[in-house]
From Swiss-Prot:
Post-translational events: 4'-phosphopantetheine is transferred from CoA to a specific serine of apo-ACP by AcpS. This modification is essential for activity because fatty acids are bound in thioester linkage to the sulfhydryl of the prosthetic group.
Any GO molecular function: acyl binding
UniProtKB keywords: Cytoplasm, Fatty acid biosynthesis, Fatty acid metabolism, Lipid biosynthesis, Lipid metabolism, Phosphopantetheine, Phosphoprotein
Ranges for domain Carrier: 2-77
SUPFAM superfamilies found in the cross-reference section: ACP-like (SSF47336)
Cited Gene3D superfamilies: ACP-like (1.10.1200.10)
Name recorded for this polypeptide: Acyl carrier protein
The organism's taxonomic lineage, starting at the top: Bacteria, Pseudomonadati, Pseudomonadota, Acidithiobacillia, Acidithiobacillales
Lipid biosynthesis among keywords: yes
GO BP term (any one): lipid A biosynthetic process
PROSITE patterns: CARRIER, PHOSPHOPANTETHEINE
Gene symbol of the encoding locus: acpP
Domain of life: Bacteria
Protein's organism: Acidithiobacillus ferrooxidans (strain ATCC 23270 / DSM 14882 / CIP 104768 / NCIMB 8455) (Ferrobacillus ferrooxidans (strain ATCC 23270))
Subcellular location as annotated: Cytoplasm
Amino acid sequence: MDNVADRVKKVVVEQLGVNEDEVTNEASFVDDLGADSLDTVELVMALEEEFDCEIPDEEAEKIATVQQAIDYVSAHIPAKDA
């Protein structure tokens, strides 16, 4: 199974319609990848579905980069899903 980082990046590519090479760990969803507020909501929903977890709104607001998404998912999903 792909690792968490690869799975997060795959979701970002699918949701934002960007090239895989644009999705670096440091990339900001809004500033670098062109996401708007609706895109970020849909991205969080897609991450929740991919990892079978719930990301509370107050936590989702703190996830602005690919690395922050990877870190959040890594810390909050059961090991069997990682």
